């Protein structure tokens, strides 16, 4: 079930699964939101889609969220692509009609699901390895850093100081507000 928590006209709704997965992969830093004791908690965490069923990530052990909320807590992960202010002065017909107002163009994906934390070394290695491999391929190519490049005792200490987690995906909604509701002369 997807709770409509934002204005989403049909012409801005994005239902292309590949495009949604592409946006999440290109802009992996999510705002991860939950409610604890009536207060909203937000963390900015890089996440990765693991197929279409789950998001994976990790937090610092010092981040108290894994102690504050229980496994199964509902989470909202918000992924935002690039965005921009759009001035009325940029429309070619503005000098003639003056029928334009400012707007903001953006793309966003909301993924809801339930979180499960893990302190197991196997899960931490899988999450850190997957996220690292994905990002290193994008930025370093053939010279990609691998976890095995670091001394084992150092990696062990780093892994001891994180908590892995998975968010089982319940729903996905995406919005691409890119002025596609305007005539072609304006975009």
Would you name each region that the model predicts?
Residues 106-108, 141-181:
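Short, active-site-adjacent segments that bind or coordinate small-molecule cofactors and metal centers
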Residues 21, 100, 154-157:
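A generic local secondary-structure boundary/capping motif
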Residues 44, 58, 186:
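Histidine-centered active-site/metal-ligand motif
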Residues 61-127:
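Short, structured beta-strand-loop surface elements
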Residues 126-139:
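Acidic, glycine-rich loop-and-strand cores that form catalytic or ligand-binding grooves
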Residues 1-5, 185-187:
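Conserved small/polar residues in nucleotide/adenosyl-binding loops
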Residues 4-55:
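An N-terminal domain-cap segment
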Residues 37-39, 48-55, 61-64, 81-85, ...:
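Short, charged/polar surface micro-motifs in flexible loops or helix N-caps
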């Amino acid at each position: 079930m997807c709770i409509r928590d934002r204005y989403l006209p049909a012409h801005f709704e994005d239902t292309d699964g590949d495009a949604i997965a592409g946006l999440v992969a290109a802009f992996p830093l999510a705002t991860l939101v939950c409610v604890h004791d009536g207060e909203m908690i937000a963390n900015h965490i890089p996440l990765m889609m693991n197929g279409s069923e789950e998001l994976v990530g990790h937090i610092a052990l010092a981040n108290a969220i894994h102690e504050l909320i229980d496994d199964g807590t509902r989470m909202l992960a918000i992924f935002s692509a690039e965005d921009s202010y759009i001035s009325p002065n940029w429309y070619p017909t503005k000098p003639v009609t003056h029928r334009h107002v400012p707007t903001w163009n953006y793309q966003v994906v909301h993924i809801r699901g339930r979180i499960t934390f893990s302190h197991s070394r196997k899960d931490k290695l899988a999450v850190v390895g997957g996220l690292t491999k994905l990002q290193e391929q994008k930025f370093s190519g053939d010279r990609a850093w691998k976890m095995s490049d670091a001394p084992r005792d150092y990696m062990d200490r780093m892994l001891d100081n994180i908590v892995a987690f998975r968010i089982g995906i319940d729903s996905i909604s995406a919005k691409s507000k890119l002025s596609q509701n305007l005539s072609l002369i304006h975009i």
